[in-house]
Amino acid sequence: MAVYYTSRSRYQNKRFCVDYWTITRTCFYRFFETEPDMKALFPKIVQMNESNQLEWQMDRDMLQKHAVTVMEGLGAAVESLEDSDFLNSVMVSIGQTHVRRNVKPQYVKKLWPSLHYGLGVCLGDHYNKEVSEAWRKVYIYISAQMTRGMKNPNLKTNDELS
């Protein structure tokens, strides 16, 4: 199930013949193609050769696990748009997790073009201008909250305060 946001109905769930794995695999393959330096941040996914150089060969199972996590996070974000405290808490926490893995705030923005590409390829005509713009806005919001968590790794989230 792919989730997308529209201005008409806040958000909608639509069933497509595409699953999270297909969208995210397309996104990450594109990401590693257009941002090859980012492969070093994914040591469990991207394989190294005997010369200690990054290879295109990837651990499919680890990529799939990460892909599902990413898309479930995006889906949860869209479904939580009306509960900004919860959404902010989750995204800040995800940012804190990423900074512990040496992901820098400026890297988060680098993923959008590849996600945009992956959604376009996989959703086809359903990924029209309105849907694309809605996803872009959601991604900007998510990125801002993740960056907040990255810049404040010790910030308590709502979940931790409960």
Label every PLM stretch briefly.
Residues 1-162:
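Globin-like tetrapyrrole-binding proteins
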